[in-house]
Amino acid sequence: MRAAGRWHSAGRPIVYLAEHPASALLEVLVHLDIGDVSALPMAYQLLEVATAAKVVVLGLPANALNASWRDDLGATRAIGDAWLASTQSALLRVPSALVPNVANYLFNPLHADASRVSIKSVARYPFDNRLFKVVGGGGKAGR
């Protein structure tokens, strides 16, 4: 990812992963800036990632985030940038800003264990137009 994201500053190599296919879809949809369903790609790709048994996955401590963390990109970026710089783990479990009690994972492709994280499968999924009736109304995709 080249642009800044919720958990990192611009220019830092990082890969965002979702805990579940449904949350991955929500993460894609929330970032789309397309005014009409017909402008969407026919499908998105869902990648399943596998890790070797000894790859360390850190969890973000509960007290690391303040009550308004969803609106404080400076704070979440500082946390992610510090984790990337620390090289403590190849993966960091972080909360989803979209859905309570759901996690996302940050993957540091520059970590020494990065080669022990691999793509297990790739599947193409079509966008279901019913999603856009809910999101934007009348077949229009919205934010």
Regions found by a protein language model. Name each.
Residues M1-A43:
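Long, hydrophobic N-terminal alpha-helical segment
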Residues G35-R143:
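Active-site and NAD+-binding cores of ADP-ribose-processing enzymes
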